[in-house]
Regions:
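Helix/loop segments that flank and initiate small ligand/metal-binding modules
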Residues: 1-49, 171
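Short secondary-structure subsegments characteristic of cysteine-rich extracellular domains
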Residues: 130-143
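Short, solvent-exposed helix-loop connector elements
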Residues: 1-5, 28, 91-102, 118-128
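C-terminal helix/juxtamembrane-tail motif
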Residues: 147, 151-171
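Short flanking/linker segments adjacent to small metal-binding domains or redox-active Cys/His motifs
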Residues: 99-118, 162-165
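Short Cys/His-based metal-binding microdomains
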Residues: 2, 32-85, 89
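Residues that mediate protein self-association or partner binding, especially
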Residues: 45, 49, 119-127, 142
């Protein structure tokens, strides 16, 4: 279910690793003896141990992207602290048809990817991107991914940013 024809392969591989807790999060690096326990705090500065569950679902900074995305696409939240359950609930949250589930799958994969790349940006470049800019990145990349695989997708940035479901004919 993480494999999606409109999502770059590297993002699907990343999600596959994420859902199996195989990313090099600080908690995994501590477990493998790569870094000391003292170096395991979340890069956002929230004070919690950086695990995949924390980073993507509980961190006060990173997890906030999900609510911004839900507001953008216009549906209610997902209530779980387990990544695999979050993925399934997010994709099936509208109870809609295959097209809406495919779109939500693409958005979930993209959000996770944006969060991970931002985590790496904070960790290795000591740079913080404001959350509204991360949402803009989700909007921009999702439009680009859809246009790259579908030449007949003619909607522009303004239409997409305003109402993506209407652009896809599912809203």
């Amino acid at each position: 279910m993480i494999w999606h024809r409109q999502v770059p392969l590297k993002v699907s591989v990343f999600a596959w690793r994420l859902l199996r807790d195989r990313l090099p999060t600080k908690s995994n690096l501590i477990y493998r003896g790569v870094i000391p326990t003292e170096a395991g705090l979340c890069v956002s500065g929230c004070g919690a141990l950086e695990s995949a569950q924390h980073l993507f679902l509980s961190c006060s900074y990173f997890a906030s992207l999900w609510s911004l995305v839900r507001d953008w696409i216009g549906f209610v939240g997902v209530d779980t602290n387990v990544l695999s359950d979050h993925f399934v609930q997010f994709v099936h949250s509208t109870g809609g048809n295959k097209a809406s589930q495919s779109f939500l799958q693409l958005i979930w994969l993209l959000c996770a990817w944006v969060l991970w790349t931002e985590r790496n940006n904070m960790c290795f470049n000591d740079s913080i991107t404001p959350l509204p800019r991360l949402l803009d990145k989700v909007k921009y990349l999702s439009l680009g991914w859809l246009k790259a695989r579908n030449a007949s997708f003619l909607f522009g940035t303004f239409s997409w940013w305003s109402n993506p479901l209407q652009c896809l004919g599912i809203g």
